[in-house]
Amino acid sequence: MSSCKTTLSEMVGSVTKDRGTINVEARTRSSNVTFKPPVTHDMVRSLFDPTLKKSLLEKCIALAIISNFFICYWVFQRFGLQFTKYFFLVQYLFWRIAYNLGIGLVLHYQSHYETLTNCAKTHAIFSKIPQNKDANSNFSTNSNSFSEKFWNFIRKFCQYEIRSKMPKEYDLFAYPEEINVWLIFRQFVDLILMQDFVTYIIYVYLSIPYSWVQIFNWRSLLGVILILFNIWVKLDAHRVVKDYAWYWGDFFFLEESELIFDGVFNISPHPMYSIGYLGYYGLSLICNDYKVLLVSVFGHYSQFLFLKYVENPHIERTYGDGTDSDSQMNSRIDDLISKENYDYSRPLINMGLSFNNFNKLRFTDYFTIGTVAALMLGTIMNARFINLNYLFITVFVTKLVSWLFISTILYKQSQSKWFTRLFLENGYTQVYSYEQWQFIYNYYLVLTYTLMIIHTGLQIWSNFSNINNSQLIFGLILVALQTWCDKETRLAISDFGWFYGDFFLSNYISTRKLTSQGIYRYLNHPEAVLGVVGVWGTVLMTNFAVTNIILAVLWTLTNFILVKFIETPHVNKIYGKTKRVSGVGKTLLGLKPLRQVSDIVNRIENIIIKSLVDESKNSNGGAELLPKNYQDNKEWNILIQEAMDSVATRLSPYCELKIENEQVETNFVLPTPVTLNWKMPIELYNGDDWIGLYKVIDTRADREKTRVGSGGHWSATSKDSYMNHGLRHKESVTEIKATEKYVQGKVTFDTSLLYFENGIYEFRYHSGNSHKVLLISTPFEISLPVLNTTTPELFEKDLTEFLTKVNVLKDGKFRPLGNKFFGMDSLKQLIKNSIGVELSSEYMRRVNGDAHVISHRAWDIKQTLDSLA
């Protein structure tokens, strides 16, 4: 993921046009003629500021706007309220269509073919034409044909309009046709936009309830807030983009100016068309009339159609799609996964009411869609018999349990690559594990949201008489907003980001950089902010049902916890703790009061950190008072042990149980045998004496009697004893001899008697055929070897040599019958101890214990996990 190149491609005029003076350079689109655009004014000043010159069209537009109010009064007095409302509703629909369809078509043809500009050039509308026919033009002022008279009139009218509008120093013929055409185009835009606005406002005014009780409530307060916010958006948008982008200037000519994101354009994509219409919904709240709300939704939706089919294509064609190589990193990762893994196919994704990437040969896709179909059909067929309380509990428990399951996978995957390891150790690939995760995550989303839809639908159906139509529509708008957020999020981060690919395939990431394109330009975590608004929309749709409020709180909390405590720490670990300020954050911090609060918090934080550092320095000074050899415990322990041995020798000079070379080696690496020297007074020795090997943690502090079994890890002290226990205990006795005062011998514990577990052990000498302890050796350590993992060949070589010495390898295959102490678990531990990965017992049985396959598989897993680090 990466930051996006700053261009105009995000929106019309989504940048500051530094036009403080007339020194801004501009050029025509096709002929590349450069010029300096004249100073222009906004729509309101042009029409209503008495200090500015007014053209004939501007005066007509102002009169038309004012006349709407007189017409409203007359129609109201003559035909009544309802007729007047519908009269202005029809007018609004006309002007809205003229805006989105009429202006849209004009701009479409101007963008593709420069129709208006070419028309002006063809008919010499803005050129100096002599009274006789110009040899280089098809235009003639002396012709009596209707067409030529018409264009002659248009020529004179347009030139008169511009001269009456612009200052005296404006030279009409010194500028290219593009700028003059744009100035005339602005007049018609003023007419359509102002009429669109005024007729809508009059319609809304006529729909406001007459009762003060219906007006003064929380809806009106929220509506006023939205209206004020809308006004700020429009004013700030014009401050940023100026007239050039406000009137679609780049459809006619291009300005050469620095592009800077600022103000409201940091908050939302296409703010003039998105949050710039919140006033519509504020007025709808004040009216509390669902008809007004539907009209507002129609107006807003048609504006988005204008954006999609007119502005965005022009922007992409003129400025590019606004993406660079870094911004497409996630998309390239998806392509790379498909390229390197031929059996990989894009995952099924649920977006709103549709499914993307359905694969007819993938069973899980049928299972997911079948689950939705079964739940929906079951609900429709049994709607009358479904208990809403039981359904609520089902939705709540399903959401909570499935979220815990998903969160656990992500947390353990982030900490130790647990999910990937689980599949690798069972013989599957890294990408296969990712595919299974994709199914799990998508199924989790589909299941929980399907249950939420069913619960909300039944809640509305059972209580429909109390449902407010406006609340129902507002709820659907919030659902649509969440659906849009999900689509924009996926568009920005692709499938790889949508499915938390950096948790599972971080080795595919080539650039450690978070994306700042699309919706992530405005919000750092859009899924945490807008990803639950649809769930809160169900609260509105159900008239604030308690069960839906509880579910909305659950959705919000689980979403917040997942982002805050699992996703954010992992992102910091993968991409670094770079502080990324969202567009909304930049705008808020740009406000002076909030900036002052932020500065105060930063100063307090610095004071606290400084005091903690000073206190830490003072506390560290006390450590210098300790002796220098305080931490050197090793020599002290050796001295204590020698003293204890000295005391034991004086008490019984012929009692001895020592490990050979114990002064040199206290850690025995398998398969190295451990040889034990023992000595007992002849009067205490019994032919049935035996020596057992135990974990120190098992025997604990009981020094007189062993209360745990040896598990077969024992040896006789004499070859003539324990004849019915096989040869193993005889072969371990390598030496025994007796004198007049004592008996001494030597016992060797090899791989047939030793433990194959890392740990601290001790030998215990037992009297006769009992568990009474006579002697205990010094504790020592046994550890598994660390095999050479430089190459898979060296790893295989060391592994086969070790298994051969342990007597569990036959024909290149692992056969645990050769040593009962070295089983499948021991082999797994050996591999894990050497290479850091674990293979499952099921996988090793599946490959028949083949040492070659096992060693190479373990080495491949190691390489995969290393690439994820």
Curated annotation (Swiss-Prot):
<feature type="topological domain" description="Cytoplasmic">
    <location>
        <begin position="209"/>
        <end position="212"/>
    </location>
</feature>
<feature type="transmembrane region" description="Helical">
    <location>
        <begin position="87"/>
        <end position="107"/>
    </location>
</feature>
<comment type="function">
    <text>Catalyzes the first step of the methylation pathway of phosphatidylcholine biosynthesis, the SAM-dependent methylation of phosphatidylethanolamine (PE) to phosphatidylmonomethylethanolamine (PMME). Preferentially converts di-C16:1 substrates.</text>
</comment>
<keyword id="KW-0812">Transmembrane</keyword>
<dbReference type="InterPro" id="IPR007318">
    <property type="entry name" value="Phopholipid_MeTrfase"/>
</dbReference>
<feature type="topological domain" description="Lumenal">
    <location>
        <begin position="108"/>
        <end position="187"/>
    </location>
</feature>
<feature type="topological domain" description="Lumenal">
    <location>
        <begin position="234"/>
        <end position="258"/>
    </location>
</feature>
<comment type="pathway">
    <text>Phospholipid metabolism; phosphatidylcholine biosynthesis.</text>
</comment>
<keyword id="KW-0594">Phospholipid biosynthesis</keyword>
<dbReference type="GO" id="GO:0005789">
    <property type="term" value="C:endoplasmic reticulum membrane"/>
</dbReference>
<dbReference type="Pfam" id="PF04191">
    <property type="entry name" value="PEMT"/>
</dbReference>
<feature type="topological domain" description="Lumenal">
    <location>
        <begin position="411"/>
        <end position="439"/>
    </location>
</feature>
<feature type="transmembrane region" description="Helical">
    <location>
        <begin position="188"/>
        <end position="208"/>
    </location>
</feature>
<feature type="topological domain" description="Cytoplasmic">
    <location>
        <begin position="384"/>
        <end position="389"/>
    </location>
</feature>
<feature type="modified residue" description="N-acetylserine">
    <location>
        <position position="2"/>
    </location>
</feature>
<feature type="topological domain" description="Lumenal">
    <location>
        <begin position="2"/>
        <end position="55"/>
    </location>
</feature>
<feature type="topological domain" description="Cytoplasmic">
    <location>
        <begin position="77"/>
        <end position="86"/>
    </location>
</feature>
<protein>
    <recommendedName>
        <fullName>Phosphatidylethanolamine N-methyltransferase</fullName>
        <ecNumber>2.1.1.17</ecNumber>
    </recommendedName>
</protein>
<keyword id="KW-1133">Transmembrane helix</keyword>
<feature type="transmembrane region" description="Helical">
    <location>
        <begin position="440"/>
        <end position="460"/>
    </location>
</feature>
<keyword id="KW-0256">Endoplasmic reticulum</keyword>
<feature type="topological domain" description="Lumenal">
    <location>
        <begin position="311"/>
        <end position="362"/>
    </location>
</feature>
<feature type="transmembrane region" description="Helical">
    <location>
        <begin position="390"/>
        <end position="410"/>
    </location>
</feature>
<feature type="transmembrane region" description="Helical">
    <location>
        <begin position="292"/>
        <end position="310"/>
    </location>
</feature>
<keyword id="KW-0472">Membrane</keyword>
<feature type="topological domain" description="Lumenal">
    <location>
        <begin position="485"/>
        <end position="534"/>
    </location>
</feature>
<feature type="transmembrane region" description="Helical">
    <location>
        <begin position="213"/>
        <end position="233"/>
    </location>
</feature>
<comment type="similarity">
    <text>Belongs to the class VI-like SAM-binding methyltransferase superfamily. CHO2 family.</text>
</comment>
<dbReference type="InterPro" id="IPR016219">
    <property type="entry name" value="Phosphatid-EA_MeTrfase_fun"/>
</dbReference>
<dbReference type="GO" id="GO:0032259">
    <property type="term" value="P:methylation"/>
</dbReference>
<keyword id="KW-0949">S-adenosyl-L-methionine</keyword>
<feature type="transmembrane region" description="Helical">
    <location>
        <begin position="363"/>
        <end position="383"/>
    </location>
</feature>
<keyword id="KW-0808">Transferase</keyword>
<feature type="topological domain" description="Cytoplasmic">
    <location>
        <begin position="556"/>
        <end position="869"/>
    </location>
</feature>
<feature type="topological domain" description="Cytoplasmic">
    <location>
        <begin position="461"/>
        <end position="463"/>
    </location>
</feature>
<feature type="transmembrane region" description="Helical">
    <location>
        <begin position="464"/>
        <end position="484"/>
    </location>
</feature>
<feature type="transmembrane region" description="Helical">
    <location>
        <begin position="535"/>
        <end position="555"/>
    </location>
</feature>
<keyword id="KW-0007">Acetylation</keyword>
<keyword id="KW-0444">Lipid biosynthesis</keyword>
<keyword id="KW-0443">Lipid metabolism</keyword>
<dbReference type="GO" id="GO:0004608">
    <property type="term" value="F:phosphatidylethanolamine N-methyltransferase activity"/>
</dbReference>
<feature type="transmembrane region" description="Helical">
    <location>
        <begin position="56"/>
        <end position="76"/>
    </location>
</feature>
